[in-house]
Amino acid sequence: MALENVTICGVFLVPEKERNMSEIRFSSKEHEKFFYQMLAKCGKHDSYYSSFFYCVGISEDTRNHVDRMFDFKERLIKPEALHEGWQTGGSARLTRLAFNLWNGYVEKGEESLSTPYEMFDCGYAPYFYEAIRMKYPEYCRELPQAVSYTHLR
């Protein structure tokens, strides 16, 4: 799909080459290895599995406890994992996003913890965008680069 030049509110939008959706940014080699191992283990490569295991793989804590978070036999998330002793503030954010991307899960009574205001307030935020992009590839394309032309007036 070709993007066109557009002017909005005095800003000239210059289309950039659309990002190749196969370019995945990982937090570490361990993250990348885990991601591909989990997809192979499940035999699924759809947006549900990809976004879930991408999130879970970001942190060593969540990678080490994937069996506490996901039932591989039934292919279901385990919400009780949010309250286990191994969880940290960061791993709980990863878990909440992974669960939400899996099936829209939001913990009753703790809905505010699943808002971007709470979840993205950590160093994992750049990787959260990648997970969202995996879940919704049809909607997550690179936006055109904005170039101001006010100096031309």
Language-model-detected regions and their locations in the chain:
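Conserved small/polar residues in nucleotide/adenosyl-binding loops
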Residues: 150-151
